[in-house]
Amino acid sequence: MIKRLDSKYEKKVIDYLNIEKEINTFNLQELKNYGFDNVFYKVYSDIDEDGNIKGILFKCFEYLTFYSYGEFDVDKFCEFIISDIEFNEISGKTECVEAIARKLGLLKYRKVHLCRLDYIDDIEKNINPNLKLKKINIFNIKKVVKLYEEIGEFQNTTIESLRSNLKSGRGYCIEERKKVISMAKSTAENDNTAMIIGVGTHPEYRNQGLASK
């Protein structure tokens, strides 16, 4: 049956997520930040008769994230979502979310790529040395949002959402003529891993290695 989990399941959940820790970097960090006893953050799972996890559903405000290693009961999770949960968006491992989306009749979706960075090569070549990195802060955050608006791949980025993201990571940008032309952020930072997100360069300044810088 699907039920809300409490802290007694913490080790079992973390071990389950660590099977594919790169995919679950964000889930692991949110779980560490918010725990199981939180008004806006909840963790649900299908637990079989032997106590094994058969998929995990995270709810943070109106946003859902789903993960399963191996097979899971699509019908059971969809019935639970329809009957008990209000949400605006669901994300997660592609094959899992696609199965749920088909069942729920969700037609609008966007795929993103997840890559693992094993080492950093020489990234300084052919980059204008006069361009300096600046940390994203309250003084340039509006310029950063403006750049998001000018890049088609990004959707619905607001000052509030950007500020929220920066609470669990850092952001850097490059300015030219008082305009932000390239940016990158991190999130879900911990002692061992972090996610690099929100990487983008203005269309007129691409292929110069700016985002790599």
Model-based region annotation:
Residues 72-78, 201-203, 207-213:
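Conserved acetyl-CoA-binding loop-helix of GNAT-fold acetyltransferases
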Residues 23-32, 91, 154-164:
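A short, aromatic/hydrophobic, helix- or strand-capping loop or linear motif
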